[in-house]
């Protein structure tokens, strides 16, 4: 790309670099020291591998499902097999590993393979020299540690499966620089003519390749091959293989399985072996066919694998960032919460809260009593005073009108029989009296109108028109004025402006607290 080339976007340039890297570094093997090791809950491993001059970031997807027995840590020296790629969101190149061996294990595995090939070429693993385990094994020699769980497992199985047997234990160390020589010496002792042994079990529990290395030593392999007594090798777990397994007459996946083999008759053992071979043959064909199909499937989708890994790595980084942010937020809120708790525990605040609670209860009680008293008084006023006063005012008005008529007639009579001055005086008196009567009538009308308005405002039916309702006890027919008199499932008669209804109480709250 020359200087005169048109500009490209960062993502396009990054993709070009990624394609070049993946094309030219499809398979790489790199060794170094691990740092910043992080095994995510998704099972993916993120790390950096370094030496004294450079650092290379890396990822191992689905690491946990492939290497469940050992977890790498900072400072481990490892050998990685993988490919180079680019993590586009950060614009950094990295190695995506698909195999990992610890540096020490790598050397041991190489020694294992070289020694295995050489001893096989010398005939130590030849199937023709292997012997069958006697069908009636009565005396069994066991070469193992006397203090481990291995000897206990063997004895437990023999006690359960065999009726007559004798176990002769030759105690040895099963790990360390002298272990191979001790085990070889034990085999030679058992092969002496004066000791009658039907079969030998060489056993040890599981461990790392370093722990089991004594069983890969040449001196022990040759001692097993030279034994005239059939030997069962029961070293490690089912997934562990040592050179002793190849040299022994029978390999047992576990020490307990070795005891099971001893207890079986030759015919039963042969039949089970044939069944196992048929099962393995069938299962192998199915397994190979399935793996071929899976390989074909992944070849078709190989182009999308990098996108998936990139997306998965982005999700893991995002989750880590969110976890750090969440932890910081939680710590911040915890500090505030602790401060609030210290404030709330203050004696002054407790006393104030108690005093406020007492005042609140007293105020609520006084308000309830006052409201109830006012309601009763208003009801009594409505039923007695206003009902009686309205007819009285009407009667007084009629009486005033009657007096006015009488005075009017008397004035006319006096005016007709009096002198001019008396007529003037009566005219003035009539005018004053008329004004007084009119004033009284106006006051009486205003008072009457005020009373009628108060009666209308206190009339329960008018109150109902404004959206309110009256509650009556369904059984006692009394007015309900407090929520304390109600409980769940009570029946209540409700009066509205245009009718009535019967309701059932489901829940009751007092001062924002749920009653039932």
UniProtKB/Swiss-Prot annotation:
Q: Which domain of life is it from?
A: Bacteria
Report the sequence similarity comment from the record: Belongs to the XseA family.
Gene Ontology cellular-component terms for this entry are:
cytoplasm; exodeoxyribonuclease VII complex
Q: What class of enzyme is it?
A: hydrolase
**Does Cytoplasm count among this protein's keywords?**
yes
Q: How does it assemble?
A: Heterooligomer composed of large and small subunits.
Q: What is its EC number?
A: 3.1.11.6
Q: Where in the cell is it found?
A: Cytoplasm
**Molecular function GO labels:** exodeoxyribonuclease VII activity; nucleic acid binding
Function field: Bidirectionally degrades single-stranded DNA into large acid-insoluble oligonucleotides, which are then degraded further into small acid-soluble oligonucleotides.
The catalytic activity, as recorded, is:
Exonucleolytic cleavage in either 5'- to 3'- or 3'- to 5'-direction to yield nucleoside 5'-phosphates
Which biological process annotations from GO are given for this protein?
Answer: DNA catabolic process
Extract the Pfam families matched here. Exonuc_VII_L (PF02601), tRNA_anti_2 (PF13742)
- PANTHER family tied to this protein: EXODEOXYRIBONUCLEASE 7 LARGE SUBUNIT (PTHR30008:SF0)
Give the UniProt keywords, A-Z: Cytoplasm, Exonuclease, Hydrolase, Nuclease
List the taxonomic lineage.
Bacteria, Pseudomonadati, Chlamydiota, Chlamydiia, Chlamydiales
Name of protein: Exodeoxyribonuclease 7 large subunit
């Amino acid at each position: 790309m020359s200087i005169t080339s048109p500009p490209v976007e960062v993502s396009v340039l990054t993709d070009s670099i990624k394609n070049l890297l993946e094309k030219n570094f499809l398979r790489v093997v790199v060794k170094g020291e691990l740092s910043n090791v992080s095994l995510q809950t998704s099972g993916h491993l993120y790390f950096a591998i370094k030496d004294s001059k450079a650092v290379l970031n890396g990822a191992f997807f689905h690491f946990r499902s492939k290497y469940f027995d050992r977890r790498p840590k900072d400072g481990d020296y490892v050998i990685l097999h993988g490919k180079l790629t680019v993590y586009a969101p950060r614009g950094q190149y990295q190695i995506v590993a698909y195999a990992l061996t610890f540096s020490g294990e790598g050397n041991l595995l190489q020694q294992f393979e070289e020694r295995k090939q050489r001893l096989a070429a010398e005939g130590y693993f030849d199937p023709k020299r292997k012997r069958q385990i006697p069908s009636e094994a009565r005396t069994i020699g066991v070469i193992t540690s006397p203090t481990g769980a291995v000897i206990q497992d063997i004895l437990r199985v023999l006690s359960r499966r065999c009726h007559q047997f004798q176990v002769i234990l030759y105690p040895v160390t099963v790990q360390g620089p002298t272990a191979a020589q001790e085990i070889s010496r034990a085999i030679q002792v058992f092969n002496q003519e004066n000791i009658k042994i039907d079969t030998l079990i060489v056993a040890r529990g599981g461990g790392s390749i370093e722990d089991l290395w004594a069983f890969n030593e040449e001196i022990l392999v040759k001692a097993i091959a030279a034994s005239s007594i059939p030997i069962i090798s029961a070293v490690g777990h089912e997934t562990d293989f040592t050179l002793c397994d190849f040299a022994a007459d029978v390999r047992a996946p576990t020490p307990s399985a070795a005891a099971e083999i001893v207890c079986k008759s030759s015919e039963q053992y042969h039949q089970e072996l044939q069944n196992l071979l048929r099962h393995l043959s069938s299962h192998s064909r199915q397994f190979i066919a399935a793996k071929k199909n899976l390989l074909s499937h992944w070849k078709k989708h190989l182009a999308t694998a990098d996108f998936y890994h990139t997306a998965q790595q982005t999700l893991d980084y995002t989750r880590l960032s969110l976890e750090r942010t969440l932890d910081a937020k939680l710590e911040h809120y915890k500090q505030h919460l602790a401060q609030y708790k210290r404030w709330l525990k203050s004696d002054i605040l407790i006393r104030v809260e108690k005093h406020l609670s007492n005042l609140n209860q007293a105020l609520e009680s006084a308000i309830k009593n006052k409201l109830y008293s006012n309601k009763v008084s208003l009801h009594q006023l409505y039923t007695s005073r206003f009902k009686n006063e309205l007819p009285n005012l009407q009667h007084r008005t009629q009486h005033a009108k009657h007096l006015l008529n009488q005075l009017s007639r008397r004035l006319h009579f006096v005016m007709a029989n009096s002198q001019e001055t008396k007529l003037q005086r009566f005219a003035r008196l009539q005018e004053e009296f008329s004004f007084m009567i009119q004033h009284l009538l106006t006051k009486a009308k205003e008072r009457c109108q005020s009373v009628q308005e108060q009666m209308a405002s206190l009339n329960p039916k008018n109150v109902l028109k404004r959206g309110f309702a009256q509650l009556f006890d369904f059984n006692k027919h009394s007015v309900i004025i407090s929520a304390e008199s109600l409980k769940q499932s009570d029946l209540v008669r409700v009066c509205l402006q245009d009718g009535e209804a019967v309701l059932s109480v489901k829940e009751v709250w007092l001062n924002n607290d749920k009653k039932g």
